[in-house]
Amino acid sequence: MRTTTSRLVQLSCGLVAAVAFLGMGTAGAEPTLERGRYLVEGPAGCGNCHTPQGPDGPVADMGLAGMMVEKNDMFTAIASNITPGSRVADWTDVQLGRAIREGIRPDGSIIGPSMPFGLYRGISDDDLMSMVMYLRQVPAVDHDPGQSVYNIPLPPAYGPPVISVAEVPHGVTLEYGAYLAGPIAHCTECHTTFGPKGPMFDTHLGAGGFEFHGPWGVSVAPNITPTRLAQYSDAELDDMIRKGVRPDGARMLPPMPYGYLAKMTDEDAAAITLYLRSLPALPDGGQ
């Protein structure tokens, strides 16, 4: 158990660093616990990977305590315990933020898949620190889910250092819809065709085709460009995104985080729909 004095010193240091970090962002911006809760428990769906799952859903009292999320020939990916009961309690707010947004731990080591760092690099400073603020006060869980194993080389970094990302104005707009569907909810990570180096955003954005393996069997991320979405009304598409229910009443398969997306506001859901409607129409799998 870490001492109270040690934790207070850690929080003080983190606060000073975070204030300096935020000073590089949008003038007058202010991260909030409420925003952090909304993002983590809503569209960002952090618990979809970081909360252990049982036969009936999330395991009680194990929120964000970590679990294995993918096992294949290339790697066994284990989502870390990100509660205050884990090693992240020893990290400053800026260090935790950097791990989330850039995939770099305080010791300089790289976090591997399945975290979508190509998109997370676009999380705004304000939203990032709001999420960190919320993660600092979730119940601490003493649980070690294990370590990821990679049979592929990891990059030295996922790009140049992220200095600052400005806030995207909220509203039912293409810009905010792209931000929600990209950096926040990472819809375009799972639904973009993968190549040897990962999602092919430049040529296959939203074309689908990636296979997911889990207790439910195998599910394939569908094409979310107008090629497939044009057949659905906005209301039908909203039910599919937030309820996991097709127009014919059929339930959709995991791992899409329907329980988290259900907590999105109507405005945010509408912004995502607006953005998806604007994508270039592509054939399934980008073929």
Where are the language model's segments positioned?
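Bacterial N-terminal signal peptides that target proteins for export
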Residues: R2-L15
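C-terminal segment of classical bacterial N-terminal signal peptides
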Residues: C13, V19-A27
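Electrostatic cytochrome c docking/interface patches
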Residues: G25-G42, P155-P183
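The canonical Cys-X-X-Cys-His
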Residues: G36, P43-Q53, M131, G177-L180, ...
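Electron-transfer interface patches adjacent to heme c in soluble/periplasmic c-type cytochromes
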Residues: A44, G66-G97, G118-L128, H204-M240, ...
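Extended, well-folded interaction surfaces typified by the phenylalanyl-tRNA synthetase beta subunit core
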Residues: D142-L154
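Small-residue-rich helix-loop
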Residues: G195-P199
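C-terminal functional regions that serve as terminal interaction/effector modules
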Residues: Q231-S233, D239-G286
